[in-house]
Structures are given as C-alpha cells and as structure tokens.
Amino acid sequence: MGSGAGELGRAERLPVLFLFLLSLFCPALCEQIRYRIPEEMPKGSVVGNLATDLGFSVQELPTRKLRVSSEKPYFTVSAESGELLVSSRLDREEICGKKPACALEFEAVAENPLNFYHVNVEIEDINDHTPKFTQNSFELQISESAQPGTRFILGSAHDADIGSNTLQNYQLSPSDHFSLINKEKSDGSKYPEMVLKTPLDREKQKSYHLTLTALDFGAPPLSSTAQIHVLVTDANDNAPVFSQDIYRVSLSENVYPGTTVLQVTATDQDEGVNAEITFSFSEASQITQFDLNSNTGEITVLNTLDFEEVKEYSIVLEARDGGGMIAQCTVEVEVIDENDNAPEVIFQSLPNLIMEDAELGTHIALLKVRDKDSRHNGEVTCKLEGDVPFKILTSSRNTYKLVTDAVLDREQNPEYNITVTARDRGKPPLSSSSSITLHIGDVNDNAPVFSQSSYIVHVAENNPPGASISQVSASDPDLGPNGQVSYCIIASDLEQRELSSYVSISAESGVVFAQRAFDHEQLRAFELTLQARDQGSPALSANVSLRVLVDDRNDNAPRVLYPALGPDGSALFDMVPRAAEPGYLVTKVVAVDADSGHNAWLSYHVLQASEPGLFSLGLRTGEVRTARALGDRDAVRQRLLVAVRDGGQPPLSATATLHLVFADSLQEVLPDITDRPDPSDLEAELQFYLVVALALISVLFLVAMILAIALRLRRSSSPASWSCFQPGLCVKSESVVPPNYSEGTLPYSYNLCVAHTGKTEFNFLKCNEQLSSGQDILCGDSSGALFPLCNSSELTSHQQAPPNTDWRFSQAQRPGTSGSQNGDDTGTWPNNQFDTEMLQAMILASASEAADGSSTLGGGAGTMGLSARYGPQFTLQHVPDYRQNVYIPGSNATLTNAAGKRDGKAPAGGNGNKKKSGKKEKK
C-alpha cells in the first residue's frame, strides 16, 4: 500500500518536472522574435532592443555575449545596449524580388549558457523605384481600315516595388482617335492597351504622336513617360491569334542549354504579307535564360537554370503579322528542384584553444548546417568523423553544439583535427565536410626570446612622421595567450617627456615608428630598450637594445652670408678700380651649409654676367676676380648672378646678385645712381602728355587756353613748396628711393640710399649732435631713409652754419679697396655746382625721412648716417648756405654756388685705388 502510494506520487511529480524544464527551454527553442522595418534604413538604425525582448538585462550583456548568426551581415547587435542594428543596405527588391512578403530569418546566439533564438525581420516596401519603360518611344503601324474598338497592346513599364508602390495605372495623352485601357495579366502585373475610337484616314493624317504615362500609387507617386508614334498604313484587319493564351511547362533545373521548352503557334486570317507571322519576346519580358525562334515559335534553354535562384519564369510572347498587328500570350515555366546542392557546414564560433583541464560537456563550438535544395533534398543530418573525445548535440533547427565527451590530455594530444560531415536525404544523397583544428592550452612556462641580441638601424633624416624605421621580433613557444607577445619601450637615452614625440612601437607587430621627422643636425643617434612580454599569468618578458643612427640628407640649401641683400632683396654694389689688373680681387661670395659631409661641400658658379669674360669666380673659394682689364667698350656697371651649390644628391643651391661699378671714388658713382629716372614717373609723364594731346584735339583752342591758364595760376598759388617750414617740419611727399647699391671689396662696404630727384620736397635741418663712431651707411627697411632722425627741438629753418673750408677725409676714413692701400691725405669740400647739388639732395632726402620719423639708420645727429670710417667730420654744419645752392628737381631755377664760381675745378680725387704694384692709378 505504501509502495503503491510512493510510485503514484513519483508518477504525479514527473509531469510537473517536465513542464518545469519545458518552461525553461521553450523560450530559447520555440519563441521567435519578430520585427518589421522599412527597406533602405540607414546603416546603424535601430531595429529593436533584442536584449530586452529576450529578457536580458544590460548587466548581463557582457557575459551573455549576444550576437547575430546569419549568412549575410544585414544586422548586428550592440554590445553596450543589446539593440539590433542595421549593418548593411536593405534593398527589398534585391533580397526578395517580387515576393509579396519579405522577411529575413536568422539566429541570435547567447552564451553562458549557450542558446539560440530565432529572429524574424520583415522588410516593408517603400516607393523607391520609378516605373520605367524598356524604351523611350514605341512605334505602331495601324491600318486605316482598322475599325473603332480595335485594341493595340503597348509597351509595358516595370516597377521593382510591390503593392501600392508598384505600377498601378497607365494614362494616354488626350486624343480624338485613341483611348487607353489598363489590363492585368495572370501574375497581377498591369499592361496598357490602346483602343481606336474613330476611324483613321491615311490621306488626311499619316501619323499621330501620343504620350504614354505609367504611374504608381506610392507616397509620393512616381511616374515615367514614353512616346508613341502611330503610323497609319493600309488595311490589315486581322491580328494574329495564339492557340493558347497561357502556356505552362515544367523543366528540371539540370536541363542543358539548347533543350526545347515548347513551341507556340499563332494564326492570321489575312493573306499575303499581312499573314506572315514573326514571334518575339515582349519588351516587358527581360529574358536571358531562354531563346526564341522568330519564325517557328520554338523556345529553347539558353543558359543554365537554377531552382535556388529562380523557381519560375513568366514569359510574354508577341506574334506580329506583316501588317504590324500584334497578339500576345504568356508562357509560364516552372523549374523543378534537383538534388544538386551539397549541404554546407558552417562553424559559427571557433575557440582559439581549450585548456586541458576542461570539464566534460564544455562547449567548444557552434555549428550550423544548410542545404539550398528543398523538401527531402534539403533535410540534413551531421556527425563527427574519427575517434575524438567530442560529441555533437542538437541545439535547434539545423543548429548544433560541439562539446567535450572525455578528459583531455595535452601531453598526449596537443591538438585535434575535428571533422564534421553533413549528409542530405536526396537520391543520391550528397554530403560535405568541414574541419577545424582545436589546440589544447598549457601553462605559461617560456619567456619570449628576441631574434637578435641587439639591433642597430640607420634612418635617413627628414623621414615622414609615422614611417617604419625598424622591426623587432620575439618568439614564445607557448600556446595561446601564453605565446602572444606584445612589445613596448621601457627606457631610452632620450628624456622621458620627449620619448613619445620621437618614436613609438606597435604592440602587436614590433614595428618601431618615427613620430616626427628626425634632424641629423639636432639628433645624430639615440638608444632604446625594448621589452617583449607574453600574455600569461604571471607574464614573462625579455629586453633588447635598439640603437638608431640618424643619417644626414641634403636638406639644407646653402645660405649666402656675403654679399648681404638690401631691403628690396637685391644685392648691394661693389666698387672696382678702373685700372684693376687681371686677377684683381673684387669681392668674395661667402656661403655656409648646415649639412655635413658631401652635402656641405660648396661650389660657386656664374649663372649670368652682363659682360662674360670680364670676371672669374673661384669654384671653391667664391672669390670674384677680374679676368681682364676694363675695356673702352665695357659698361661701367656690371652685374653677376652667382649660384652656390652644395655636393648633395640632388644638389641644392642659392643665388646672389653682385652689382659691380668701375670707379675710382664714391663721388663718381653717385651721379650715375641718382640721375636714373624712376620708370613709374616716366610712365606717368607719358600718360599726362597723351591726355593733354587728346584734350587739345577734342576741345576748342580757346577753352584749352583758359584751362591751362587756370591750372597755371592754381599751381603758382599752391603753398605746398613751403610745407617744410611748418612747426612740425613734416614732409608732404614721401621720398622715393632707387634700388640699393654697395660699393666696396672684402675689407669694406658702402650702403647708400639716394632720394629721387623728381618729386621730393626738401627740408633743411640743422642737427647739433655729432655722429657716433662705428656706424655704417645703411638703407632703411621700407621708407628709403638715408640719414638719422634729429631731435625736433634742434631743427631750424632760419640758421645755417657757415661752410668749413678745412673739411677733410682722413686716411682712415677714405674708401679704398683694402685697408693697406694709400691715397691722398687731403680732401676738400665739393666746389663744383654738380657735387654741391648732389650732396644737398642727399642731405635733404635724409631730412625728409627724418621728419617722417621712419628712418631706421644708424649714426648720430648731423652725420648723414655715415660710418666712423667716412662720417665723423662730415656733419651738417659744413653744408654751404642752402639759399645759394638749393636745387629743386623739376624746376628751371638758376643754380648758384659761390664756391663753384670761385673755383671751377673738380674736387680732389682722394682715395684713388692702387694697383697691386703699389703705383697710383689715374682716372
């Protein structure tokens, strides 16, 4: 009695236990998650929260490792939120074609514990395709004897969308003779038929032009048009008639190209040409798998068929008689499936290794089998090949788990080749196999070993940032993470804060990258200590040294130190004695190169010379010497364009322009420089005369005379010429400075700026301070000022110091070709009118710049900015009375100079340059 009650109690508990277990596994095995989304959703769009729909919390996501298992990567699961995201383009027409329902089915895989979940995503159609005709225009030939009510089939349009988004209606442009009827085929597609409303008369009108419009009912609706050209012909009142409106035939997918599908027939009650029938595919049928004999109507297979791609074909045929009348029929071809596809085994997840102490039943891999065939040809079973300590468990439909079935021992078998064979139920059955190699993991007992004990690498400077400069490699005989080596930099002879800005190393590959462009001139070598570390626990490591040597490249062009450039970038002039003998040292081009080795070897070359053969240039020294004596036909001013090249490959170069003037004193050079007209003034003067000439021609002479007198009176009454006597002593017009020149050889150099003589207003200033010694004649940066600015409190326009009759240049102050050359120790103030005017123009131009406050020249007040060598005694107090010597350029005022009248001789030509023999050279 008691045993019976106990058995009865156990019997009652078994269904309860079964229902409990079923409630646990049924959500994973039975439920299917469904979503519905429109096609063409952007990549990254959210389909739904898969984790929430499966009952997972956000905290479980890292351990459950929820992911998608599908053949094509249409979707992915966000690891952070568990949302199902679109990962590739969803084109419903490409995925499902014309199917009314389109859905993507796949499995969602979750681990710990391992489960599969079926997900179904329905793709809704959107109106993203416009109806399109196969051609832009159609031509119809209609007999004039055609009766009203005769129908003519027109070319159809195609719309890849479905439902209301697909082609729904055709419209015909208004016509007195034609109307349009929308027809529907057996497959539901629409096609237009044009109906003749009134009889045609070819003698009245030979042709008609109509517009056919195809529309869909999408939102917004889309449409396209085609032109219909109707030609009216003579009578052909009977159209061809097919023996059947619809032909149906079944074909095996394995039939060979050339196999006859069927033969259609059509008759025409007309006679002669109007009864000759030709067959063709309709323009709406884009058929590439079949061929049609236009005369016999025989349809044959053109290309191989595939049930897995297309299961049936709907072909529209046309029969056209000689009069242009057309009849249509439909041929429906059903493709029969054959067992021509072997099953496939796909491993969804593959472990890198499994530890040898893994427990029985440990999950190793997930695999899925599939067969493209249908029915029993697509039913698949799978099994393991060979004697291996594993087994396969069925998880869900066509999904299996590979788990351990025995204790593993790495010392006996460090790895296993696991082969899974899938076989279908077709006749004959087809099968396929897939293999994986499973490694058995061990403990971390080997440290990484570098392939070399140390590394030395050469890197050319100016390398691109991010370039690879070296690669180190270390091997570890361990398996899995114990043998995975990562690299890092642990020490260097560079400062720690600068290390990351110089080099970095790839932790995976050991490739050392330059983070910046190296400069041989700043850093020639450095050393790194690299470490290779495995991923074991505890981790083992090894160190190695890497020495990087930075090689020099020709990346620095030569830099010309002498001659220096003026503010406008041109070279200053050098003065050469007129009697200079061949070999006379004129000047020397001095340049440097920041590179080293051959890249810093410099050579000097003449690129251009105004008088070839007059000068020679030292290839390595850069010395410019006279190659011959100055001839009578040689110009006084010469120009040399010199190139300085280094020895690099390719060589870099710099250029310098030398302006050489043959003269025995500075006074000879000044008139030649100052008298040159400004090109811009010449152009302005030319334009002025052209305007005056045109005015004289176009305007009456009397009016021109009145305007000229008025302009003359206005100019004579302008007080601008007295602007220099304003309290501020400011110049009204900015002085114009011609190009800079330098006079001198190696021991000395003159820098001279001369104000333009055509438009400058002169202000006479008196400066009481003396010029400080040791300052050279320099040119301003941009204003063209020559002389230093005097204190405004010391300027006056009413007093002028008397001339100093004992004004001299001392021997140390006299210009010459070298410091050792001798000359006359006496020098007088210029006594002729030209030199006096020239000197005053220089002084007044300097005063004008000083009044503007823009002069940047050195020198004390009253010294004209001359250096100590030429300037200490040359002060403004030696300038003759400006009321006697002033000369305003552009005027015809008579110039007076008491000294010039008193002594008509030219000033003494002091500092005449000597030849090498020591004799004086006459002008």
Swiss-Prot record:
One of its GO terms (biological process) is nervous system development. SMART domains: CA. Glycans are attached at residues 417, 543. Its main location: membrane. Residues 1-30 form the signal peptide. Gene3D superfamilies: Cadherins. It is a single-pass type I membrane protein. Potential calcium-dependent cell-adhesion protein. May be involved in the establishment and maintenance of specific neuronal connections in the brain. It is found in: Cell membrane. Residues 913-923 have a biased composition (Basic residues). Residues 711-923 are cytoplasmic. Keywords: Calcium, Cell adhesion, Cell membrane, Glycoprotein, Membrane, Repeat, Signal, Transmembrane, Transmembrane helix. Residues 31-689 are extracellular. One of its GO terms (cellular component) is plasma membrane. Residues 797-832, 893-923 are annotated as: Disordered. Pfam families: Cadherin (PF00028), Cadherin_2 (PF08266), Cadherin_C_2 (PF16492), Cadherin_tail (PF15974). Residues 31-133, 134-242, 243-345, 346-450, 451-560, 568-673 form the Cadherin domain. InterPro entries: Cadherin-like_dom (IPR002126), Cadherin-like_sf (IPR015919), Cadherin_C (IPR032455), Cadherin_CBD (IPR031904), Cadherin_CS (IPR020894), Cadherin_N (IPR013164), Protocadherin/Cadherin-CA (IPR050174). It comes from Pan troglodytes. CDD domains: Cadherin_repeat. The chain crosses the membrane at residues 690-710. This is Protocadherin gamma-B4.
